[in-house]
UniProtKB/Swiss-Prot annotation:
Family: Belongs to the influenza viruses Matrix protein M1 family.
InterPro entries for this protein: Flu_matrix_M1, Flu_matrix_M1_C, Flu_matrix_M1_N, Flu_matrix_M1_N_sub1, Flu_matrix_M1_N_sub2, INFV_M1
Nuclear localization signal, short sequence motif: residues: 101-105
One Pfam family named in its UniProt record: Flu_M1
Name of the gene: M
RNP-binding as annotated region, ranges: 165-252
The name this protein goes by in its record: Matrix protein 1
Misc note: Most abundant protein in virion. When expressed alone can form virus-like particles in transfected cells.
Membrane topology according to the record: Peripheral membrane protein
Cellular localization per UniProt: Virion membrane; Host nucleus
Region annotation (Membrane-binding) ranges: 1-164
GO molecular function: RNA binding; structural constituent of virion
Amino acid sequence: MSLLTEVETYVLSIVPSGPLKAEIAQRLEDVFAGKNTDLEALMEWLKTRPILSPLTKGILGFVFTLTVPSERGLQRRRFVQNALNGNGDPNNMDRAVKLYRKLKREITFHGAKEIALSYSAGALASCMGLIYNRMGAVTTEVAFGLVCATCEQIADSQHRSHRQMVATTNPLIRHENRMVLASTTAKAMEQMAGSSEQAAEAMEVASQARQMVQAMRAIGTHPSSSAGLKDDLLENLQAYQKRMGVQMQRFK
């Protein structure tokens, strides 16, 4: 796996699923391929994106700044600086300085990532802030190692939280989660279907599913009534894809 592929993988792992994630993935691909060279416009676009947490925006801003060539005097962006200040915690800053000294002696991506993984996400973000604010300089490879370690720490905690929700025995939470998944699956089906004639059927199924979820929420239904809703939708989507000559079995 190439270095930039690895960076893209780690960064996207902390972005919530949805149309915005696809858009960010495209921007990252363009930046890494050298197709997008307007850092100013890129940062303005990032700043105004909804849903993303300030820290995720900070990390993406850091990656864009590392990758896109820019004039030396280009102004640092406040939204990135604020996100990478370790919540203003002096302990994070102390640890970030210690980490920075170690990273300065490192030259490889994997070496930097290994060192960084033993620090908390707050200290890692602060260390990125030091580099972003030009208070410290490391090689681009080392900076990317720091980015990936930070994303791994964040993704780990997101995964633990997600696992807790999936494993919950509370029927109301499980019911709502199934309805949310069915609704987002229906939305994805509508986007994938496009405008071909064969798409009408898939669109109809997706539309009915969304109406059904709305009705279930409006009248309040038994928690078990949502069981299998998303899987039924995915089966419909796969049947539609087969007719279109597309074989993709890995949705579940």
